[in-house]
């Protein structure tokens, strides 16, 4: 099994798709990586030679920020926004949508499940 950037790539998938299992690499990036390395995108991971795997690993390590490093950078960026107290930081802190979406209705993914507010009547 090919292991790149700490991720085991699925053996039965095409290399182009298998590379997208690495956090920070999508389809366009995987196509660029394969073009640089000269590996055929239609090749299955199980059919890759050790040399091809090493070539892919080198290109990814040198040119791309992936997995833990990328996750850490994103987390630090969000933390910085929160610390400086900008609008986006406040939205992150409150768990609301950051990019201008409406919140009167919808936004359930970001807000979480509804908290129903009950009304008490006098007896």
UniProtKB/Swiss-Prot annotation:
Residue ranges of the region described as Disordered: 97-123
One Pfam family hit: Ribosomal_S13
Gene Ontology CC: cytosol; small ribosomal subunit
Record's keyword terms, sorted: Ribonucleoprotein, Ribosomal protein, RNA-binding, rRNA-binding, tRNA-binding
Secretion signal, residue range per the UniProt entry: none
TM region(s), chain numbering: none
Source taxon at top rank: Bacteria
GO molecular function: rRNA binding; structural constituent of ribosome; tRNA binding
GO biological process per UniProt: translation
Keyword Oxidoreductase: no
InterPro entries: Rbsml_uS13_C, Ribosomal_uS13, Ribosomal_uS13-like_H2TH, Ribosomal_uS13_bac-type, Ribosomal_uS13_CS
Family stated for the protein in its record: Belongs to the universal ribosomal protein uS13 family.
Assembly description: Part of the 30S ribosomal subunit. Forms a loose heterodimer with protein S19. Forms two bridges to the 50S subunit in the 70S ribosome.
HAMAP family: Ribosomal_uS13 (MF_01315)
Known function: Located at the top of the head of the 30S subunit, it contacts several helices of the 16S rRNA. In the 70S ribosome it contacts the 23S rRNA (bridge B1a) and protein L5 of the 50S subunit (bridge B1b), connecting the 2 subunits; these bridges are implicated in subunit movement. Contacts the tRNAs in the A and P-sites.
Protein name, entry field: Small ribosomal subunit protein uS13
């Amino acid at each position: 099994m090919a292991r790149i950037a700490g991720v085991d790539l699925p053996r039965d998938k095409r290399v182009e798709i298998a590379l997208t299992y690495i956090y920070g690499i999508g389809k366009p990036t995987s196509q660029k990586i394969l073009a640089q390395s000269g590996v055929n995108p239609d090749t299955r991971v199980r059919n890759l030679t050790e040399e091809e795997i090493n070539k892919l690993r080198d290109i990814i390590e040198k040119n791309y920020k992936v997995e833990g490093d990328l996750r850490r950078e994103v987390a630090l960026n969000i933390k910085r926004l929160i610390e400086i107290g900008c609008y986006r930081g406040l939205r992150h802190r409150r768990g609301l949508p950051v990019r201008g979406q409406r919140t009167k209705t919808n936004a359930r993914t970001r807000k979480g499940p509804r908290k129903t507010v009950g009304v008490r009547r006098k007896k």
